[in-house]
Amino acid sequence: MFEATTILAYKGENHSVIGGDGQVTFGNCVLKGNATKIRMLYNGKILSGFAGSTADAFTLFEMFERILENRKGDLVKSVIDFSKEWRKDKYLRRLEAMMIVMDRERLFILSGTGDVVEPEDGKIAAIGSGGNYALSAARALDKFADLPESELVRESLLIAGELCIYTNTNIKLLEL
């Protein structure tokens, strides 16, 4: 588990939303409270977020963007090619980062070992040290509350920020 952040993705009926907190931690010190760990890719058609080492995450973002361009925005083919490339490269296999990527139809977690996981329910995924808190909150809110997608993600991340010492409540969201 990476003691770095919380990223939550939710694919609702009307919108896909990804959100993350802004805390950057080094050991037991908070270095920054307003970092951006989520991005739009491929002309605003793909959402992504990372947890883990910032330098490693930027390496992965660049690699994924290149593959996404080569695959003309096909998310499924891109995550498969990305995983294959990640597993083949000895340097990449040592990177300490995870990513979530999504469009309006699909949602994937890309692990630090090159694994690709599509959530069982196909609509909620979380990574990072506060990921389990955010995931639990999102599942409960999805089941029992009638919130817009962006509010469900924001509230779930706020709960994670109250519980996880490596996550703050400076939440940023992106939506498709």
UniProtKB/Swiss-Prot annotation:
It catalyses: ATP-dependent cleavage of peptide bonds with broad specificity. The active site is at residue 5. One of its GO terms (cellular component) is HslUV protease complex. Allosterically activated by HslU binding. It comes from the Bacteria. One of its GO terms (molecular function) is threonine-type endopeptidase activity. Na(+) binds at residues 161, 164, 167. It is an enzyme of class 3 (hydrolase). Keywords: Allosteric enzyme, Cytoplasm, Hydrolase, Metal-binding, Protease, Sodium, Threonine protease. Its EC number is 3.4.25.2. It is found in: Cytoplasm. One of its GO terms (biological process) is proteolysis involved in protein catabolic process. InterPro entries: ATP-dep_Prtase_HsIV_su, Ntn_hydrolases_N, Proteasome_sua/b, Proteasome_suB-type. CDD domains: protease_HslV. SUPFAM superfamilies: N-terminal nucleophile aminohydrolases (Ntn hydrolases). Protease subunit of a proteasome-like degradation complex believed to be a general protein degrading machinery. NCBIfam families: ATP_dep_HslV (TIGR03692), PRK05456.1 (NF003964). Belongs to the peptidase T1B family. HslV subfamily. A double ring-shaped homohexamer of HslV is capped on each side by a ring-shaped HslU homohexamer. The assembly of the HslU/HslV complex is dependent on binding of ATP. This is ATP-dependent protease subunit HslV. The gene is hslV.
